[in-house]
Amino acid sequence: MKKIYIRNHAAFAGKWIYEGFYAAWKSRGFLPIYYNTLDEISGDNYDLMAIDHDIQTSAHLEVIRRADRTYLFVQPISFPKPWGLHPNFISQMPQQFREEVRGLSNVHKWSFAKTQEIEYYSEWGEIETVHLAYDSLNYKLEDNSCYEYDVCYVGGWADNGFNEKRSIILEHLGKFKNSSLKCAFAVNRGISHEQENLLLSRSKVALNIHDAYQRSLGLDLNERTFKGLALSGILVTDSVRVFSEVFPEMPTYQNSSEMIDLVEHYCSLPEHELADIRQFNQKEVLENHIFNNMNRTQIS
């Protein structure tokens, strides 16, 4: 059984995202092993899912070289202000190593963002865009024939260095204060995997809110996009350009007023209409946007 080392993410969205990759590799017959630093990896005959800022020394670069194949998640070299002023948004790999990595034939560079149209990633060379997906191995649709909630939201403040998400979430969820909708909002509650699975499955509508940079640049989607569509089947999400490219038939909202109007619209529909929409959306996700469907990406 071939080993594949996967960067460990202990918290936040990265935890759930890389658990999805872990389960996908395991389902394909690999032996996935989490690592915290590249110093932990020795020997040969392994594949590797690494992150650019893991590579800080020549020894780290050697671990990349020794891998049969390295799937390297890369950050941009520069980024629009204000976000580009914070180290969270740009690559921390030393330039000399970046130049060496570009010449390694065993390194497959990828990003969640649509990088082909922008200059921020140009020093990396060719990069594959791998949008996030639904983890169909760790999440399972529960019986939703009897809904407990009209609308749900599960997420955190996710401070990316500018603490923008908190005010966005408060504004949007505050719109429901005087509505008659039955709401289930879990923000920074640390609910269990099982609770989240059940909450999304038992809600008519799943709400989605992206970060400010995602709204502005429109290059990538959050994990909640795919969980909401797969488990609830009805997603009300903000307008992000790449969402409309990936899911062209799904409406989006431009502001919090449009958001609540769209939620109320869905909740007013007859059940048979909701069921048709739900079935269409869930089929789209399960066929084209799951971690263990490796045909959706060149990561294989």
Where are these regions (language model features)?
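C-terminal "capping" alpha-helix adjacent to the active site of nucleotide-linked donor transferases
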Residues: 254-272
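Nucleotide-sugar donor-binding catalytic core of glycosyltransferases
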Residues: 2-46, 51-67, 74-249, 292-294
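A charged, aromatic-enriched C-terminal amphipathic alpha-helix characteristic of glycosyltransferases
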Residues: 268-300
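Short, hydrophobic/aromatic alpha-helical segments in well-folded domains
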Residues: 224, 262, 280-281
